[in-house]
Design a protein with these regions (language model features):
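Conserved phosphate/anionic-ligand binding catalytic regions in large, soluble enzymes, centered on
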Residues: 2-13, 95, 145-146
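Short, small-residue-rich loop/turn micro-motifs
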Residues: 3, 39, 43, 113, ...
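Long, non-coiled-coil amphipathic alpha-helical linker/lever segments
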Residues: 8-56, 116-129
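Internal glycine-rich alpha/beta core junctions
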Residues: 26-29, 57-198
Length: 198
């Protein structure tokens, strides 16, 4: 008696979300570092600057990578904030009054899981914590989609300013094995749309 299924479920979900955030933070940090490194490596590599997909003024690939690194840095800051915002736990009984469970249980469990106890939860942890994280995840997905959409455009046969790696033995098409399709970029675009839709 005392602990509700929501006490367990909400607290476990928030713990899982913090662990997922840790993985995402590490991945976004790597993406930012790679883009930053490439920005310096490509700082003198001229390319066509475009607006609305049309040739505009010259720029460098370094500038593109620098722009992406900065965007990932902002995403990293947002993810860290969202992780803090979702790191809550509540083990306070049926309506949040601790009438049948000692507050020490909540404090102990939250401390062990690296969570903060939600000071005014009722039966459930407020969903604004989850919604904020979902919004940040959509923003990170939008960053990824923006980058790979540009990379896909730069890989077109008539442009060919950039291309994905093509492994030995890899086939671009079952009917035309010589093709070098931007498969990774296409997958990232598709997955980012799934994230943004949810």
């Amino acid at each position: 008696y005392g602990m509700t299924s929501t006490d367990l479920g909400d607290t476990a979900l928030c713990y899982q979300l913090t662990q997922a955030c840790d993985l995402l933070i590490a991945a976004v940090r790597r993406c930012a570092a790679i883009c930053k490194r490439r920005a310096f490596e490509e700082r003198d590599t001229l390319c066509v600057g475009r607006t609305h997909g049309i040739h505009a003024e010259p720029m460098t690939f370094g500038m593109k990578f620098g722009s992406w690194a900065w965007e990932f840095k902002r995403d990293l800051d947002r993810l860290k904030d969202a992780r803090k915002n979702v790191a809550y736990g509540a083990i306070s009984g049926a309506v949040g009054t601790y009438s049948s469970i000692d507050p020490f249980v909540e404090e102990y469990v939250c401390e062990k899981l690296g969570l903060v106890h939600d000071p005014l939860s009722t039966q459930v942890i407020s969903r604004d914590h989850h919604a904020y994280l979902a919004g940040v995840l959509a923003t990170v997905a939008a960053t990824c989609e923006r980058i790979v959409t540009e990379m896909r455009a730069l890989q077109k046969t008539d442009t060919l300013e950039a291309e994905e790696p093509f492994r030995k033995g890899q086939k671009g098409s079952s009917a035309m094995p010589h093709k070098r399709n931007p498969i990774t970029a296409e997958k990232i675009c598709g997955l980012s749309r799934v994230v943004k839709a949810n």
